[in-house]
C-alpha cells in the first residue's frame, strides 16, 4: 500500500459554501517542510456516524496487520504529551486548562458549551481549540504514515484532505441507536437516552466518500473489510 503516492488536495478545489480557510493539509505541509505538491504515502480514511461500526471495522484491519490511526485516541495522547499544544490551549483557556499536568476536560467542556467566556462565544472557542488540535493530529499522521485513519469527524477536521481514498461506514438509524445505547448508556434504552442518541445522530452529517459500506449486521465484518481492501 505504501508504494502508492498522491498529491494533497487543495481546498481551492473543494466548494464548502464558506469562506476559504487554511486547511489542515496546508498547515501540515508547512510545519513538516513539504510543499502542497509533494508526493505523500497513500492513506485510506475510515469514517461514519456514531453507532455505524467504524471502530469495529478498524479493529478488523488491525487484526490483519494494518496500521490504523485512531484520531480520537491519538488526539488525547497529543494533548497529554505535546508541550506546544498544551501551551496553546493554556493561552486560549487559561491556567485551569490543566490540573497537575492533566488536561481538564470538564473545565474545557464547560468553556466551549457555555454562552460566552471573556466575551468569546463557546462556538468560537471550540473552533479555536480545533484549530490547535487538528493540525497537530494531521502532522502526527504524516509522521506516523499509517495505512488507515479512523475519525468520526474526518471531513469536519479537514483530515480528509490527507487521505487518498475514504470509506464511509453506515447503518440504519435504529441499529445505530441500539449500538450506541449499549456502548454509552450500558443498555439503558430509556426514552430520554434514545432521544439523546437520536439527536446526536441527526446532528451529524457525513459527506459521501469513495466507498460506502452498509454495516447492518447482515454482512460479516471480515467481508466488509474485504470490500475495502478490494477497492484499494
Descriptions of predicted regions:
Residues 140-142, 149-181:
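ATP-dependent NMP and nucleoside kinases share a basic, alpha-helical "lid"
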Residues 137-141, 161-162, 173, 182-232:
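Small-molecule kinase domains that catalyze NTP-dependent phosphoryl transfer to phosphate-bearing small molecules
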Residues 52:
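ATP-binding Walker
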Residues 73-146:
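ATP-dependent small-molecule kinase phosphotransfer cores
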Residues 2, 6-41:
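Extreme N-terminal, non-catalytic leader segments
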Residues 46:
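Hydrophobic anchor at the beta1->P-loop junction of P-loop NTPases
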Residues 55:
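Walker A/P-loop
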Amino acid at each position: 500500500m505504501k508504494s502508492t503516492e498522491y498529491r494533497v488536495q487543495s481546498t481551492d478545489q473543494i466548494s464548502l459554501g464558506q469562506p476559504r480557510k487554511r486547511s489542515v493539509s496546508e498547515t501540515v505541509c508547512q510545519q513538516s517542510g513539504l510543499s502542497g505538491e509533494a508526493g505523500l504515502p497513500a492513506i485510506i480514511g475510515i469514517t461514519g456516524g456514531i453507532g455505524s461500526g467504524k471502530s469495529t471495522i478498524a479493529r478488523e484491519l488491525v487484526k490483519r496487520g494494518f496500521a490504523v490511526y485512531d484520531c480520537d485516541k491519538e488526539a488525547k495522547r497529543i494533548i497529554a504529551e505535546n508541550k506546544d499544544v498544551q501551551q496553546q490551549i493554556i493561552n486560549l483557556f487559561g491556567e485551569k486548562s490543566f490540573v497537575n499536568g492533566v488536561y481538564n476536560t470538564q473545565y474545557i467542556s464547560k468553556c466551549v458549551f457555555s454562552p460566552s467566556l471573556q466575551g468569546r462565544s463557546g462556538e468560537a472557542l471550540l473552533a479555536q481549540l480545533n484549530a490547535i488540535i487538528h493540525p497537530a493530529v494531521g502532522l502526527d499522521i504524516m509522521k506516523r504514515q499509517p495505512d488507515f485513519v479512523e475519525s468520526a469527524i474526518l471531513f469536519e477536521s479537514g483530515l480528509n484532505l490527507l487521505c487518498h481514498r475514504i470509506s464511509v461506514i453506515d447503518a440504519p438509524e435504529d441499529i445505530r441507536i441500539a449500538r450506541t445505547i449499549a456502548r454509552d448508556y450500558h443498555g439503558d434504552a430509556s426514552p430520554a437516552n434514545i432521544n439523546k442518541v437520536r439527536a446526536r445522530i441527526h446532528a451529524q452529517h457525513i459527506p459521501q466518500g469513495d466507498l460506502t459500506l452498509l454495516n447492518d449486521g447482515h454482512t460479516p465484518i471480515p467481508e466488509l473489510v474485504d470490500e475495502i481492501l478490494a477497492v484499494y
